[in-house]
């Protein structure tokens, strides 16, 4: 498994600062945020300008380019995102599910949309991943399984995020066992309680909440998962840089200890 951090944790800072701090925290790689409103890292509207900067920074800091997070399923936006992924060398694009929880028609619309986007991902030679998300059409294990049954493209996979499954009232470790064969990316953070939001950024750091992340990573290891495990902490755009660095380092230390306990490192 490759440990990375999503640049959205450092959403208030420029890319040179982000790469430097993620390297200093000891991560293997980086997930580049293309989340409008949360960061100005990979801006899809001007990706041609961003691409060489990202490639140069990755080489300079020895960080693997693990994934991109671009939440929109808009076909034009995603087409540009896929072109950017190819140019930069990002093998995975993580998008949001969209839609409405508990609405079968909404879920079917999401399945249709993701199926079309998976075809485009195959065209570009990248992998499209989606995760269950609180309040969205895909929000728990049953809805996740419906999507996985409907879309068999090898260019499509699951981005498994234990914090959303936890807030859906499930046990993330058991939920992971049901889908692990289709997992191609992992977003990781901790969470206290089962409310709609994941909590303050510092409360999302691995080990601060209620999720059995050791058990979670053990299941991944036991099933031969070798893909990215990317820390995704949101809400820290206005935080001082030092605080963002501390969150990144704390979470990475917890992940490293978990992998060592599993025998994965």
Q: What do the predicted segments below correspond to?
A:
Residues 31-55, 101:
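Glycine-rich, proline-tolerant flexible connector loops at the mouths of alpha/beta enzymes
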Residues 41-48, 76-81, 241:
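Metal-dependent catalytic neighborhoods of phosphoester/phosphodiester hydrolases
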Residues 9-11, 34-36, 71-73, 97-101, ...:
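Active-site-proximal loop/turn and secondary-structure-junction residues that shape catalytic pockets
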Residues 31, 67-69, 94, 129, ...:
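Conserved beta-strand positions in the central sheet of alpha/beta enzyme cores
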Residues 57-60, 64-158, 167-169, 243, ...:
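Active-site acidic/histidine proton-transfer and metal-coordination neighborhood
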Residues 49-53, 77, 172, 213-216:
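Alpha-helical scaffolding within the catalytic cores
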Residues 1-7, 11-29, 59, 86-89, ...:
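Histidine-acidic metal/acid-base catalytic patches
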